[in-house]
């Protein structure tokens, strides 16, 4: 029997070059490349900006991103460039897939060329020291532009393989939401809308913490009961923290919350899961990071969120235990102990507050 592929069910997209959206993705990592490829497949006039000119030239010649997605052929219409001005001038939407530590610097560089373009973050993380989320940085560096954030359970290799997936575009602007949906929505990739920018962004950033925890647990061969407890208590931590930040806790019931948390915590494809597994296998953070060869946002997020949680007095035992394991030399089993302490608490505290237990 021939192997079934979802892509076999999909009709080719009819392209109208006169009305095609002009999309640029900044960042040539796995997720940025996957989104650029989706936009190109949907008939958008699509560029991807990559710092290294040789890599950009290689992608244009081979239509393969050999470093991040070596097993997939990219759309022939997708153009890679290394010149920032060329990448962002006269475009409709700029999708920014830059690691959080470089996000602000890249926005500063493109600021002189931004006129009416919408800027949408694809980055899941927080800026070190400032505790700024990517939407905060967009507002600070490009105060006049319409903006949004894209987040969801989006493992790049699955998207490239044509497996049905979904994501969330969050923006205060209905026009931005519609434009991003138009650019990326397809028969195999569904794009939902939200106006809770901070909630969607928090879900995407915070879940990286718990993917590290699940990776460590996998190295210890934890059972299904324990995995379920990590997932649900992680969701409780995320919701508590989000409320303190002004987000709607109900947002965490959607794709950008529990959906992203489930996918990232259960997939060996996740960078944060991989680095957790390496740590649980006895490697140091330096060794694990070197082996991975890509940025794992969860490590920085653990540091930033732990500090903010202490400042805001938010109860986050898993996050605190992870910090102690990674940075203070505590045994990894401390994470399991963090799930079991502090006695009688309610399961869903927005339904039954702790003081009523």
From Swiss-Prot:
Task: Report residues binding NADPH.
Answer: 30-31, 51, 124, 156, 271, 297
Q: According to its UniProt record, where is this protein located?
A: Cytoplasm
NCBIfam families in the record: PRK00094.1-2, PRK00094.1-4, PRK00094.2-2, PRK00094.2-4
**Biological or metabolic pathway of the protein:** Membrane lipid metabolism; glycerophospholipid metabolism
The entry's family comment says: Belongs to the NAD-dependent glycerol-3-phosphate dehydrogenase family.
The task this protein performs is described as: Catalyzes the reduction of the glycolytic intermediate dihydroxyacetone phosphate (DHAP) to sn-glycerol 3-phosphate (G3P), the key precursor for phospholipid synthesis.
The record's Gene Ontology cellular component field reads:
cytosol
Give the protein's recorded name. Answer: Glycerol-3-phosphate dehydrogenase [NAD(P)+]
Name where it mostly resides: cytoplasm
Catalytic activity reads: sn-glycerol 3-phosphate + NAD(+) = dihydroxyacetone phosphate + NADH + H(+); sn-glycerol 3-phosphate + NADP(+) = dihydroxyacetone phosphate + NADPH + H(+)
Q: Which UniProt keywords apply?
A: Cytoplasm, Lipid biosynthesis, Lipid metabolism, NAD, NADP, Nucleotide-binding, Oxidoreductase, Phospholipid biosynthesis, Phospholipid metabolism
Q: Does the keyword NAD apply?
A: yes
**Active site residues per record:** 207 (proton acceptor)
User: A biological process (GO) annotation for this entry?
Assistant: glycerol-3-phosphate catabolic process
Taxonomic lineage per UniProt? Bacteria, Pseudomonadati, Pseudomonadota, Gammaproteobacteria, Moraxellales
Give the E.C. number(s): 1.1.1.94
The protein's organism comes out as Acinetobacter baumannii (strain ATCC 17978 / DSM 105126 / CIP 53.77 / LMG 1025 / NCDC KC755 / 5377)
Q: What class of enzyme is it?
A: oxidoreductase
Q: Where does sn-glycerol 3-phosphate bind?
A: 124, 152, 207, 260, 270-272
Molecular function, one GO term:
glycerol-3-phosphate dehydrogenase [NAD(P)+] activity
Q: Which Pfam families match?
A: NAD_Gly3P_dh_C, NAD_Gly3P_dh_N
* InterPro entries in the cross-refs: 6-PGluconate_DH-like_C_sf, 6PGD_dom2, G3P_DH_NAD-dep, G3P_DH_NAD-dep_C, G3P_DH_NAD-dep_N, NAD(P)-bd_dom_sf
């Amino acid at each position: 029997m021939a192997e079934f592929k979802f892509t076999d069910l999909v009709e080719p997209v009819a392209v109208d070059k006169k009305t095609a959206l002009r999309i640029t993705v900044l960042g040539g990592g796995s997720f940025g490349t996957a989104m650029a490829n989706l936009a190109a497949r949907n008939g958008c006039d699509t560029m991807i900006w990559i710092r290294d000119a040789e890599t950009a030239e290689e992608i244009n010649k081979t239509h393969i991103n050999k470093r991040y997605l070596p097993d997939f052929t990219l759309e022939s219409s997708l153009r890679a460039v290394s010149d920032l001005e060329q990448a962002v001038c006269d475009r409709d939407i700029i999708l920014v897939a830059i690691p959080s530590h470089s996000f602000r610097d890249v926005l500063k560089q493109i600021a002189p060329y931004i006129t009416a373009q919408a800027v949408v973050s694809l980055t899941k993380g927080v800026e070190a020291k400032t505790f700024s989320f990517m939407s905060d940085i967009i507002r600070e560096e490009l105060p006049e532009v319409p903006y949004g954030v894209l987040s969801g359970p989006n493992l790049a290799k699955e998207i490239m393989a044509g497996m049905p997936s979904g994501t969330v575009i969050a923006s205060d602007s209905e026009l931005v939401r519609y434009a991003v949906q138009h650019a990326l929505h397809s028969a195999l990739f569904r794009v939902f809308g939200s106006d809770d920018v901070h909630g969607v962004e928090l879900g995407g950033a915070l879940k990286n913490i718990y993917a590290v925890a699940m990776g460590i647990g996998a190295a210890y061969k934890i059972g299904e009961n324990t995995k379920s407890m990590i997932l649900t208590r992680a969701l409780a931590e995320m919701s508590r923290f989000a409320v303190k930040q002004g987000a709607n806790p109900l947002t965490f019931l959607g794709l950008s919350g529990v959906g992203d948390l489930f996918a990232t915590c259960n997939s060996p494809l996740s960078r944060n899961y991989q680095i957790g597994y390496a740590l649980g296998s006895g490697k140091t953070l330096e060794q694990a990071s070197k082996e991975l060869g890509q940025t794992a946002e969860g490590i920085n997020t653990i540091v930033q969120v732990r500090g903010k949680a202490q400042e805001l007095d938010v109860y986050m035992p898993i996050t605190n235990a992870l910090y102690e394991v990674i940075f203070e030399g505590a045994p990894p089993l401390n994470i399991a102990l963090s799930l079991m302490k502090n006695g009688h608490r309610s399961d869903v505290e927005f339904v039954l507050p702790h003081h009523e237990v």
